[in-house]
């Protein structure tokens, strides 16, 4: 229904569907962290929304003339830390404020591969074209995904007991995958 409030999270598929819904006058919040592909990055983003986290300059890094967040898509990157933080924190505040009123949360997973920043042992939402040596690549198990999602779903239900959650899988292919088998497993 056009009156439903919808938040979409995930891959470029979620982004495209969300933009199509917006163009047709649905009430949507599309990818508050920008495009995210793996289930753990999306869980981390939801935890940050649930906890009303505010980003500081310590959460950013500078590379290639821009400030970036490991958890956000490059649409949030900016030439100054202040501008980057303003974009990130504004979207976080909007998502946190809107969560209790949502009717639908649509989650689209694009891959079961996650990347961990070695230096901080954290899952990242975006590698921002940084050297491979900074990251550990991991194929998530079903058990890991289920465990993380069970916890965040419990918290989401506390904030919004009537929230309907739709999980989808992105129809994308991993063209840059080292092997066709990786695409299949992912």
Predicted regions and their residues:
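A solvent-exposed, charged loop/short amphipathic helix patch at secondary-structure junctions
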Residues: 118-142
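Short beta-strand segments
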Residues: 10, 106-110, 168
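Structural motif
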Residues: 5, 104-106, 164
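Basic, amphipathic N-terminal segments that precede the first structured/catalytic domain
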Residues: 4-7, 13-98
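Short, solvent-exposed beta-strand-terminating loops
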Residues: 109-120
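Short amphipathic alpha-helices and their capping/turn segments at secondary-structure boundaries
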Residues: 88-105, 151-159
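Active-site segments of SGNH/GDSL-like serine hydrolases
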Residues: 112, 154-177
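Single conserved hydrophobic/aromatic residue that forms the stacking wall/gate
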Residues: 175-186
């Amino acid at each position: 229904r056009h009156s439903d409030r919808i938040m979409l999270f995930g891959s470029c598929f979620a982004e495209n569907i969300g933009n199509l819904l917006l163009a047709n006058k649905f009430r949507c919040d599309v990818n508050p962290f920008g495009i995210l592909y793996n289930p753990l990055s999306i869980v981390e983003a939801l935890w940050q929304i649930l906890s009303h986290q505010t980003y500081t300059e310590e959460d950013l890094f500078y590379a290639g003339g821009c400030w970036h967040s490991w958890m956000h898509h490059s649409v949030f990157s900016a030439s100054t830390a202040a501008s980057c933080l303003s974009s990130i924190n504004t979207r976080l505040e909007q998502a946190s404020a809107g969560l209790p009123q949502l009717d639908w949360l649509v989650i689209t997973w694009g891959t079961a591969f996650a990347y961990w920043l070695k230096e901080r042992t954290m899952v990242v939402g975006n590698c921002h074209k940084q050297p491979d040596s900074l990251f550990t690549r991991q194929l998530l198990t079903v058990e890991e995904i289920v465990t993380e999602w069970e916890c965040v779903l419990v918290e989401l239900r506390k904030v919004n007991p009537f929230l309907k959650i739709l999980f989808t899988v992105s129809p994308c292919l991993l063209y840059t995958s080292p092997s066709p088998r990786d695409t299949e497993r992912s």
